[in-house]
A protein has these predicted regions:
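Phosphate- and other anionic-substrate recognition elements at nucleic-acid/protein interfaces
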Residues: 1-156
Length: 156
């Protein structure tokens, strides 16, 4: 079994893969503009891979790429607040973060987050967007009322 830690960023990720003894098998930077890099990387592994990365704003994008891969045995979403408590480091680079996540997964001490099913994720996304637009509509209405209220002195 291999263990992969992914340090996930907005435009790229750094992947560190360890074997069962903790030796680094491979480390690679994958640009998000070319997500097939993730597929290729895990397809080339000779053993099943268990993957972990921290929950971020766009976590579901990567999850939907990794979860269906045949060679990926599990995908764990780590709680970023609890992981920081466990893996605090003075010298912090993307590689060190990816290695730390892979090590925590190998030792089975990753504080995991719940991953809702795809239908629930889509519903939440729609509700978030609706909530945003309702807040924007309310803000615009309040602003219009404020502007009109300030114009009363012009009518007399």
């Amino acid at each position: 079994m291999y263990y992969a830690g992914i340090d996930y960023h907005k435009r790229y990720s750094v992947v560190s893969i360890q074997n069962a003894q903790g030796q680094i098998v491979q480390e690679q930077r994958v640009d998000h503009a070319h997500p097939e890099g993730f597929r290729r990387l895990f397809r080339e592994c000779p053993e099943p891979v268990s993957v972990v990365y921290e929950s971020t704003v766009n976590w579901s994008w990567l999850y939907e790429i990794l979860e269906p891969l045949k060679n990926v045995s599990s995908v764990t979403l780590a709680n970023p607040f609890k992981v920081r408590l466990i893996a605090e480091a003075q010298i912090k680079t993307d590689q060190i973060s990816a290695r730390a996540l892979a090590t925590l997964l190998r030792l089975n001490v990753v504080p995991a987050c719940h991953i809702p099913d795809q239908k629930t994720r889509r519903r939440r996304e729609v509700l978030r967007q609706r909530s945003y637009w309702v807040k924007m509509r309310t803000a615009v209405r309040c602003r219009v009322h404020q502007i009109l209220g300030n114009q009363r002195h012009l009518s007399g």
